Each structure stands twice: as C-alpha cells, then as structure tokens.
Amino acid sequence: MAGASRLLFLWLGCFCVSLAQGERPKPPFPELRKAVPGDRTAGGGPDSELQPQDKVSEHMLRLYDRYSTVQAARTPGSLEGGSQPWRPRLLREGNTVRSFRAAAAETLERKGLYIFNLTSLTKSENILSATLYFCIGELGNISLSCPVSGGCSHHAQRKHIQIDLSAWTLKFSRNQSQLLGHLSVDMAKSHRDIMSWLSKDITQLLRKAKENEEFLIGFNITSKGRQLPKRRLPFPEPYILVYANDAAISEPESVVSSLQGHRNFPTGTVPKWDSHIRAALSIERRKKRSTGVLLPLQNNELPGAEYQYKKDEVWEERKPYKTLQAQAPEKSKNKKKQRKGPHRKSQTLQFDEQTLKKARRKQWIEPRNCARRYLKVDFADIGWSEWIISPKSFDAYYCSGACQFPMPKSLKPSNHATIQSIVRAVGVVPGIPEPCCVPEKMSSLSILFFDENKNVVLKVYPNMTVESCACR
C-alpha cells in the first residue's frame, strides 16, 4: 500500500513539472485513443483508410445514406391521406446537392489560391445554401506569440486564432481577377484535436457570382498575423457543397437529360473511393454498345426482328438473362401431321411441358385487373452504370391490367373512367376504348452520380417508383 502511494505521488510530481514547462501531458496507453474521422494515425475503421482527397466523396456518401435510410423507412400508409408524394425534409427543401473540388493554383500570382469550377450549375438550379469546407491542420502546431510575458494557457491562445477568406472571381480569357468578398472564421468554434476542419457559409457570394455568370471562383486562406501549421502530411483539399432546388427536375425526360448526357464520360478517371463504394462503380463490368445503331430505348419503337445487335459485344459478354434452349422433342406418332405443315423455320421457341406449366401457373396467379407489377431497373442494362455511383438498381414497378366494367372500388377509378367504362360496355358509341391502368401515386428516388466535370452530385428525382395504380 505504501509502495502504491509512493508511485502515485511520483506520477503527480512529473505531471506538475510537465505543466510548468508548458508541455501537454501525454495520455497513458495512446493505442487506446479513439479514432477520429480523418485521423490517419489512429487505427481501425474504414475512415482511417480514406485518402485526404476522398473527404468530399465521404461527405456526399454520408448525405446519400442518410436520405436513403429515411426514404426506406417510409410506411405504406405515409402516402395515404394526401395528394402530395412523401418527401423527407433533409435537403433543405431542395432536390439537388452538388459538390465541387478545389484545385490549388500555384502558377497564379496569388499562391495558395484554391479555384472552384462551378460551371455545372444550371440556370434552373436556385441556390438555397452553400458552404465552404477547408482543413488547416492541428491546432497544437500553430505558432503564436503570447502578449503576456508570464505565459498563456493553450486554450487562451486558441481564442485569438482567426482565419481570413478572400473570395475572387477569375477570368482566364482576360487574365483578370476581381475581389468578390471577405470572410472570417474563428478556429476555436470547430476545434478537433487531430485535424481541424472549418466551414463557412458562402451562400451570398455564390448567388452573386451566379447572377453575374461568373463560375470560376477562387479562395485565398490566410491567418491574421499568425502562421498556419506546416503541412507534414498532405491536407485534404477544400470543397464546396451547394444545396439547390432544380425547377426543371419535374420536366419531361429530366432524368434522361441529366443522366444520359454523359456519353463522353471519361472512363477510368473517376476519383478514388474506399472499398465499399468501388463495387458500386463497376466501370469495367459492361462493354459499351455500338454507337452506330439506335436501340429501342432511344428511338421509342418496339423491338423487333429488324433490330440487329452485335452479338459478340452485347449479349454474349453481358448475358443478363438465362439462355432458353429448346429441348429435343420426344418421338410421337403424329409425325405425318407435322410434315404436312409449311417447311419454313418456326420463330417460336419450343419449351418443354414443365416450363409451360410454370408459365400458365404464373399467369393464373397474376391478377388480370389493373394492378402494380414488379419491375427492377438495373442501370448497367441501360448503359448508365459508369457514372451512377448509387444505387446500382431500383424497384420501379409498373401498372398493367384491365379496367373493365364494372370496376371494383379497389381500382380507385375516377368519375370519368367510370362513365367511359359504362359507355364502352353499352356499346352506344363504337370505338371507345376501356380506361387505362396508370400510376396513381409515385415516390422519388435519390441518385448519386458524377457530372461531366467528375464532381459528385446528389439529385432527388420525383415520380420514379410506382406506389399504387388506378384506372383513369
């Protein structure tokens, strides 16, 4: 007991000496220190394996996962009782989040100027908010001159640290730069022991730049009379997140115009992602279709025998479906009857009896009335998997079936559909078709993808998944 007290007294003495010398006492068992996101020295966890340049990708992935989790947690009853589709309020009442990576401009007159290319912002996207994220390293390595001769505590010094941000608009055609505004950030507000990430709202600056059609923005990060820590390790580059509301996202073919417009997307040059995202990219798993042939998806025509695909490039390499092969027919006594038919090759596949029974059973089980049917869309099948990060596929569903008279209440027919079905059943007016089975309620889908400048974008597209069907 006396020995333990002596050891405790000795440890307290060393602790006081270290405080007198202005040193921070090192915690015992440093290997048990909790890992902090962005800390490359702490072990464990996928965050410790991320490269500094992947910080923006990690941020966008967390935002996508958060939205997708809330979207998946919706209940079927959440759509009832209202005409507006269910939509979580996570994107600040917007439907678009764009990320922009910075590029250090060492060749310009102002060294340390980080340039952002904002040309991906469209005219239809109204900026709701914008934030600049930047890293300044460890606060403990910042050299400060204390005004008091007696010495200052570490926390007292930290209160005087302030970062200045100078925003510039750049015009490389004229080799000119114009001051856009000044901002300041207090480092103590966002302190982290390992890597200090700071953020600053730049909404007004970007709105002003977009209004003047100035999409090349530069930020110069400095400190007031104090020296920022030297970069012992490469710091993550600054990045900008822009929350916007795209007014044209509900327009016809908005998904095709924004996602299919990446036909010249440079494959193999996407930014690095960690292991659980690389599988979502799968850039090399699909061969490009022939550019000289219009597919049925592009010309809006039904596929037929006149559409000739390159067998070696598409179907043999991809093989999304199991090949159906005709089995050898059993010997029968009706060979003479079979020979009497025309001697041309039949274009109908010959199935065995077991396959036909399964097809009939499946047809009997499926309702003939208007109902929601299952449809899974894989982005690899339509050639979009190279730039869409997540999801790889989604359940779209579709509506199909008859709306015959009398229509049950479960089909939720409109008054016009009810009258139309009666007129068709009576037959007074010839040529009247029956009402159509169409989607009644639909939900949105969030898609994470690369834009033409290889920036990560999150968009929430409305009316992507059928929730219920009705006769109209």
Curated annotation (Swiss-Prot):
Skewed-composition ranges (Basic and acidic residues): 27-37
Residue ranges listed under propeptide: 23-362
Keyword list, A-Z: Chondrogenesis, Cleavage on pair of basic residues, Cytokine, Developmental protein, Differentiation, Disulfide bond, Glycoprotein, Growth factor, Osteogenesis, Secreted, Signal
Region (Disordered): 27-53, 320-350
Compositional bias annotation for Basic residues: 333-346
Tissue specificity: Expressed in adult and fetal cartilage.
Glycosylation sites: 117, 141, 175, 220, 463
Signal peptide: 1-22
Cited Pfam families: TGF_beta (PF00019)
Induction description: Highly expressed in fracture tissue, particularly in osteoblasts, osteoclasts and chondroblasts.
Domain of life according to the entry: Eukaryota
CDD domains reported in the protein's UniProt record: TGF_beta_BMP3
Record-annotated disulphide pairs: 370-437, 399-469, 403-471
GO (cellular component) term, any one: extracellular space
Entry's Gene Ontology molecular function annotations: BMP receptor binding; cytokine activity; growth factor activity; signaling receptor binding
GO biological process: cartilage development; cell-cell signaling; negative regulation of ossification; osteoblast differentiation; positive regulation of transcription by RNA polymerase II; skeletal system development
PROSITE patterns: TGF_BETA_1, TGF_BETA_2
Similarity annotation: Belongs to the TGF-beta family.
Subunit and partners: Homodimer; disulfide-linked. Interacts with type II receptor ACVR2B.
Protein's job: Growth factor of the TGF-beta superfamily that plays an essential role in developmental process by inducing and patterning early skeletal formation and by negatively regulating bone density. Antagonizes the ability of certain osteogenic BMPs to induce osteoprogenitor differentiation and ossification. Initiates signaling cascades by associating with type II receptor ACVR2B to activate SMAD2-dependent and SMAD-independent signaling cascades including TAK1 and JNK pathways.
Protein name listed in UniProt: Bone morphogenetic protein 3
Organism: Homo sapiens (Human)
